[in-house]
């Protein structure tokens, strides 16, 4: 699926995201300001997990792009499942990239759940962190994107910094409702809950993406981003399982990414890996 659709959605005459749609989660307390967790999650993400809370609505005024960008400027590094799952969880490292302000440059590290709904349409929900040329003034931001709103949603309450490692969880408990959660301040923070025409299972992606503004072509640099502890939630229930070689997986052609100067290294197929600038030849 072309990730450029998301950037096009940002600029289709829409302002920054309206509050994320909540379904059966209004009873969650508001999340308090805190810091990135240094300990891994102790329970599955759920509105019934201990001290679960709901994030504030995405903050207005972070800015928006003003014209569509060409998909030719994209580089994708990662993998996707070829079977459907009920969710995905994992940890993403935050880095400071060379994204230029007031451009359509962006770097994003994210998980996605998606399904083809026919007639060329795809429904999806994604969550991760991003550094963009149009929002955040050079900061890295937690974000979500879904095909109900077709908008990037930035969560300014979470003060990220390079070196942070953040846990994210995307899953469904049924009824076509898919949720994105962030493990922050040692509790699960609900980012968004969306009723999507995906069903009880979806295809899963894990990617680091780089987009270079085609109107202002330049070479971007990307310090190595680590993705690890990636686990899949089985459709129909059961314990999470690590995304390993026994999971039917599709990876893209790495040649175009190397041409752009970006390399992917699998530490363990497919739950631990790095992506970033290719090593300089000696």
Across the structure, where does each feature detected by a protein language model lie?
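Exposed, interaction-prone regions of secreted/extracellular proteins
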Residues: 23-282
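Secretory targeting and sorting signals
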Residues: 1-24
């Amino acid at each position: 699926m072309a990730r450029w659709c998301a950037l096009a959605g940002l600029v289709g005459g829409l302002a920054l995201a309206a509050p994320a749609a909540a379904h059966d989660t209004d009873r969650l307390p508001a999340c308090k300001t805190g810091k990135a967790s240094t300990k891994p999650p102790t329970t599955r993400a759920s509105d019934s997990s201990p001290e679960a809370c709901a994030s504030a609505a995405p903050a207005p005024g972070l800015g928006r792009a003003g014209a569509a960008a060409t998909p030719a400027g994209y580089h994708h590094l990662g993998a996707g499942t070829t079977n459907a799952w009920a969710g995905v969880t994992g940890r993403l490292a935050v880095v400071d990239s060379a994204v230029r302000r007031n451009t359509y440059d962006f770097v994003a590290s994210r998980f996605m759940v998606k399904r083809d709904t026919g007639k060329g349409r795809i429904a999806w929900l994604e969550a991760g962190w991003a550094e963009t040329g149009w929002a955040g003034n050079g900061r890295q931001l937690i974000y979500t994107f879904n095909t109900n709103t077709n908008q990037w949603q930035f969560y300014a309450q979470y003060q990220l910094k390079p070196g942070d490692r953040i846990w994210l969880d995307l899953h469904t408990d049924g009824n076509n409702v898919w949720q994105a959660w962030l493990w922050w301040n040692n509790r699960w923070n609900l980012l968004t809950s969306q009723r999507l025409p995906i069903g009880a299972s979806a295809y899963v992606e894990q990617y680091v993406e780089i987009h270079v503004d085609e109107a202002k072509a330049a070479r971007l640099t990307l310090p190595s981003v680590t993705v690890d502890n990636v686990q899949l939630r089985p459709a129909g229930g059961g314990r999470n399982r690590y995304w390993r070689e026994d999971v039917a997986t599709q990876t893209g052609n790495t040649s175009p990414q190397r041409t752009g100067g970006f390399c992917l290294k699998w530490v363990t197929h497919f739950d631990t890996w790095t992506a970033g600038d290719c090593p300089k030849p000696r």
